[in-house]
């Protein structure tokens, strides 16, 4: 078995790129891509390092997308091995970012090297959109690169995001879409006072409770064949001074929608406002638009991905839209077809994160086969 993917994955993991740091990961990738004819364009926005690398100037444009940043390691005492000293144990590569997503990055680079060596005159173009701001606030990462590309009319046809999509074995699941995400920050106003004199106060918790109950019980839509019904979840509630004898003067509630293509953010916002107003609440509310829902249905990218997975691994893949958000949400609105395909996600963001070495080698072969199907 070739050790190319393993070696590069280890080199990437050894760089402690806790978000928003890159710690030299992108230059490492860039050096190898430049040797294969890629034009390397670093894009640094404030604290975030991004890279746009492209080989070719014609369409269609296939883009590998991913991130070099990783989440913090947590309690070091719970790690069996140092998180930034990658080691292989019983066939698994251990280290922070092994599964999310430095194993995928290594597979992308090696797959591209192999493809270009075999098909130097391939049709279209290949690109890499890499950021160090996926695990963080996602302000200066992929979204800023996409803005730059849009401004110069550089259009991505197909994008493969290397997020760890697999559940039990490599390729059993690919993400061909994601739900939208909308966060609300609600402040319900009241009048602070002594609990013994409620007539002199106005308890915002009591006032808000019926409205919150209605929001929690509301059926927002029925979903569809690609998306489950929209979900409303209260994430945080804060009210009171900590004392048992004080009626609070305000209540703060943070909630989130994960919504399907059956509704829009604007529809959800209006329905929330209607409920709050119907309960006569005095409130302030602000909204954070985390991402629109997107879906890549049957077409060249999804078809090539399903075929490649089966041909390399023998697995019949299941396209799904479940899970959290990814940077695919910033790429899809440009009109690109977007799918996510990466290794098993069982240990992502956990202590002792690891990935099966055989899986990232197989992943490189799948990525290469996808390139062959689309650009040969």
From Swiss-Prot:
In this protein, the active site sits at: 69, 134
Please give a single GO biological process term from the UniProt record.
Answer: L-arginine biosynthetic process
Q: Which InterPro entries match?
A: ArgE/DapE_CS, Bact_exopeptidase_dim_dom, DapE_proteobac, Peptidase_M20, Peptidase_M20_dimer, Peptidase_M20A
State the reactions this protein catalyses: N-succinyl-(2S,6S)-2,6-diaminopimelate + H2O = (2S,6S)-2,6-diaminopimelate + succinate
Q: Which UniProt keywords apply?
A: Amino-acid biosynthesis, Cobalt, Diaminopimelate biosynthesis, Hydrolase, Lysine biosynthesis, Metal-binding, Zinc
Report the EC code(s) recorded for this entry.
Answer: 3.5.1.18
Family membership noted in the UniProt record: Belongs to the peptidase M20A family. DapE subfamily.
Q: What is this protein called?
A: Succinyl-diaminopimelate desuccinylase 1
